[in-house]
Amino acid sequence: MSKIIGIDLGTTNSCVAVLDGGQVKIIENAEGARTTPSIVAYMDDGETLVGAPAKRQAVTNPKNTLYAVKRLIGRKFDEKAVQKDIDLMPYSIVKADNGDAWVEVRGKKLAPPQVSAEVLRKMKKTAEDYLGEEVTEAVITVPAYFNDSQRQATKDAGRIAGLEVKRIINEPTAAALAFGLDKTEKGDRKIVVYDLGGGTFDVSIIEIADVDGEMQFEVLSTNGDTFLGGEDFDQRIIDYIISEFKKEQGVDLSKDVLALQRLKEAAEKAKIELSSSQQTEINLPYITADASGPKHLNLKITRAKLEALVEELIERTIEPCRVAIKDAGVKVSDIDDVILVGGMTRMPKVQDKVKEFFGREPRKDVNPDEAVAAGAAIQGSVLSGERKDVLLLDVTPLSLGIETLGGVMTKMIQKNTTIPTRYSQTFSTADDNQPAVTIKVFQGEREIAAGNKGLGEFNLEGIPPAPRGLPQIEVTFDIDANGILHVSAKDKGTGKENKITIKANSGLSEDEIQRMVKDAEANAEEDHRLAELAQARNQADALVHATRKSLTEYGEKLEAAEKESIEAAIKDLEDILKTGDKAEIDAKVEALSTASQKLGEKMYADMQAQQQAQQQQAADNAKPVDDNVVDADFKEVKRDQ
């Protein structure tokens, strides 16, 4: 049975792991790194770069290099958070026909799941290279506070990448799995997972219990902010650099796309350096130019300055912690361990804030970049039956309900309910002889439905005429283990029923997903074609070089016509190298090989002659120098003493 891999699809970086021989293995990518930047670049020759190669060229290709796309996944274009990102991102965020936030690259509109699928494809390939077999199934992690549309969109991304997503699992829960199975501490423990990543923040309170030899992970509560993460910290530094440069040089860099990309790189580097040193210097020569000539940027930033810039962002993570503790029905003093996940938790100020709130030192023995992927791989092994000693009880992060008379949100399933779960409630009509009802489904905590996230709607028709309040309509909410919602409505009188799987009132249709899957497959074929073309060019290049070298050494031994025919074949091959396809290059390589046959014969004959000459010389050296050797007589003369 093939392995189910675990993928942490992050805003900034992604990671892939697998359970191999009972141990979790974090798999290195083709570049030798254990994490891969979640960056996709679309080149002008049609090639798609993913990961470190995409990141390296971002400065020169900012409009077609997509990063932090996870912040857009499953979101509407008109949402406040998306509108804020439009001004910050160098690439173009556009409104899709269904109202979703999409991106536009080189004149083509792409859905965020399509872009995320490119990253997932690289993760899939990384795992396949390591395992030496095809991988078709995965567990993918999402922020615990992701709503239904965002979870559905992540699942779609997996499908587009050619993966069957066996389970969508919450990031903090995955980290708890990795932590819990690795530890020797016995007995029940309550832990907090504080997960501050590149684009999202989550906090979960989880109880780990040993039930008859089985490790049980029960999520007691979860909370968070899906638009708060390392990208926001970077932005604070960028804004500061821009304002300082404007004060000094009078030039506004915020409108210069190329400069902004360099600033982003520098800000991220400075942020990382300031976690281990007290001061860093940002040095960007030729950042811009005006009438007086080129301008250079040189700026020192201290750790204290960075902390002042981002203090409010760190403070924003504490309120969700407070709510999560309250919802879990525990006290801060009941917490046994605090686990830090996500690259941003390496920042000393973040660690101090967490320690201050929870009153204990966070654990340092969990790798914040790899724990989530490791947990996903463990869940994969549970689903494949490889491990049978783990039970995971996750929760739905937000309340789910329907809109009832007066626009009120009637909650069917409360937040932090353990999933999978099912709940039914009976409703009635609001008017006499009402022939149909519209069931509008919402997710969120507000009392008025319009203040929450609309997930979808459907009609139940054919209700027989009756006074208001008489028909009985049973509405059932069913959440599966992925946290994805299925809703049905049934008229108890007639038995008529209608149901939907919530796909958001937008999201990708089945046709769109299928088209994107085909696109992705075509892309894979195109990548293969480009790789073959590159190989053909390299081989042709090597042949031209070798033939030229031989021609210089042995050319005078050829007849003029033979030499001319080889030189013409070399020129033909060189002409086709840059523009030709593989078949054309192969044909010219064949022609050059045929033309240089005579040259090969001359080289071979010459080498044979040289070898014979060397053998002859060796034989001569082995003979005595003179055959006329004369034996000499000698006589011993004894002298008198």
From Swiss-Prot:
The keyword Chaperone applies. The keyword Chaperone applies. Residues 606-641 are annotated as: Disordered. Signal peptide: none annotated. GO terms for molecular function: ATP binding; ATP-dependent protein folding chaperone; unfolded protein binding. Keywords: ATP-binding, Chaperone, Nucleotide-binding, Phosphoprotein, Stress response. Transmembrane segments: none annotated. Residues 608-619 have a biased composition (Low complexity). The modification Phosphothreonine is found at residue 200. Residues 632-641 have a biased composition (Basic and acidic residues). PROSITE patterns: HSP70_1, HSP70_2, HSP70_3. It holds the Pfam family HSP70. Induction: By stress conditions e.g. heat shock. Belongs to the heat shock protein 70 family. Acts as a chaperone. This is Chaperone protein DnaK. The lineage of its organism: Bacteria, Pseudomonadati, Pseudomonadota, Betaproteobacteria, Burkholderiales. The gene is dnaK.
